Amino acid sequence: RFLLNGVCYERLLLRNFDDRERTIRLDIAFAADFADLFEIRGKPRAKRGQSAQPEVEADRVRLSYLGLDGRTRATILRFGPEPSSIAGDHARYQITLGPREARSLFIEIICDERSEEKTPPRKTFFSALRRARRALRRSSARAASVVTSNEIFNEAVRRSVADLYMLMTDTPEGPYPYAGIPWFSTVFGRDALITALETLWLDPAIAQGVLKHLAANQAVDFNPEADAEPGKIL
């Protein structure tokens, strides 16, 4: 399972370890409540928008929600191969596996309708996986390489670098380390500045991206609702 450009790609591998043919029923349940971040953290809302009826096709379900701001938000699920049956809250597979046979099921969870493709999920999974790996290699290739005679230390460094780049988002101004996943997956000013300072030796491009992005988001006028004033960042 991995995320790329607003889409969650998932592969389920089913394997029959028996010497006989086996038939199984697999139900995949799903739902979307479109709760905002504060609701998820336990803060109740006085009013909510309206969830629409699921739009169900042979291999696709669209779940949508009309917010109080008048915007419609949607989550789309695509399945490959086509399920035996499908409804607005689950997909059902009736699968027969021969002795030692393995079979893969592919699921796409699309959070931005503009990211939806017409290619079968099996093909999009592997092409997206290659793109994700290339993007990660490009980003981490900027980092300085640290190798010592202590393999435990080396692994700690590799893990730390991998975790750092998991938080990295490419903005128009350059790479920017978001504050945390999942609660704070957005731009924080001081957190990013501290990270940029401490990683100058590792990857100077992070500091460049942080400074340029913060400079691009300086207020130019007074706006009490946004707590903005000239020169203030974010």
Regions found by a protein language model. Give the residues of each.
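Low-complexity, acidic Ser/Thr/Pro/Gly-rich terminal tails and inter-domain linkers that flank the onset
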Residues: 1-7
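Short, charged/polar micro-motifs that form catalytic or ligand-binding hotspots
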Residues: 2, 90, 182-186, 196-204
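Acidic/polar, glycine-enriched structural segments that form the non-catalytic walls/loops
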Residues: 7-9, 16-187, 208, 220
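Residue-level signal for well-ordered alpha-helical scaffold segments within enzymatic catalytic domains
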Residues: 105, 197-198, 209, 213
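Well-ordered alpha-helical scaffold segments within catalytic/enzyme domains
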Residues: 143-144, 148, 193-206
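Conserved hydrophobic/aromatic pocket- or pore-lining residues that grip, position, or stack substrates
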Residues: 160, 195, 214
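Helix-terminus loop motifs that line ligand-binding clefts
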Residues: 175-177, 203-234
